[in-house]
Amino acid sequence: MKTVTIITIIVVIIVVILIIMVLSKSCVSHFRNVGSLNSRDVNLKDDFSYANIDDPYNKPFVLNNLINPTKCQEIMQFANGKLFDSQVLSGTDKNIRNSQQMWISKNNPMVKPIFENICRQFNVPFDNAEDLQVVRYLPNQYYNEHHDSCCDSSKQCSEFIERGGQRILTVLIYLNNEFSDGHTYFPNLNQKFKPKTGDALVFYPLANNSNKCHPYSLHAGMPVTSGEKWIANLWFRERKFS
């Protein structure tokens, strides 16, 4: 009788352990999924193309209250008067993107704590971050569908990659809400986002453990119909950004 009881207990323990293992794999959070971002360039082929749509991918999500409204105002005031026409990889093309932008050094005391916060939460090195890009959209301005990283073997892409590899993490902060429309739209997911002031939209340009752009990461800044839309982009590369 004692032997049967001991066997039953052992079986129950094994079943419980197996259940815990299954749940731990299926319930991995967004933050744990990016825990290895700082080493995801290991053993990857330099095949900068497109992943299949059914390849593994962590979908976009909103990170609430990343910065407070006072900090948002401070960034907008600092950027105002320093803006120039936004650019894409191939230069300035207003048929693709017709906003205004400027850059703030990631070492600027005004924004450095934001970067450090993201680095802690997502386990990415500070050195892998680009500078902060601040963007303003006026009425009827937009950014057509695009990927945040490189998806072909063009000269522009090669030069882009040389500066630290692919972009592997995008943190897009909405600095204000005083505008109409202007959502961030992911056509292949049929999802659009318009976070509140100080919230960040987080997404990954690449398929999991890959150098390839995932179709789900294709996105657009929809046209603003009234007011001014202000955002700030934090991008992190595979390696140290230069």
From Swiss-Prot:
Its cofactor is Fe cation; L-ascorbate. Residues 128-238 form the Fe2OG dioxygenase domain. One of its GO terms (molecular function) is procollagen-proline 4-dioxygenase activity. SMART domains: P4Hc. Keywords: Dioxygenase, Iron, Metal-binding, Oxidoreductase, Virion, Vitamin C. It is an enzyme of class 1 (oxidoreductase). Its EC number is 1.14.11.2. It catalyses: L-prolyl-[collagen] + 2-oxoglutarate + O2 = trans-4-hydroxy-L-prolyl-[collagen] + succinate + CO2. GO terms for cellular component: virion component. It is found in: Virion. Its main location: virion. It comes from the Viruses. May catalyze the post-translational formation of 4-hydroxyproline in -Xaa-Pro-Gly- sequences in the 6 collagen-like proteins of Mimivirus. Belongs to the P4HA family. This is Putative prolyl 4-hydroxylase. It comes from Acanthamoeba polyphaga mimivirus.
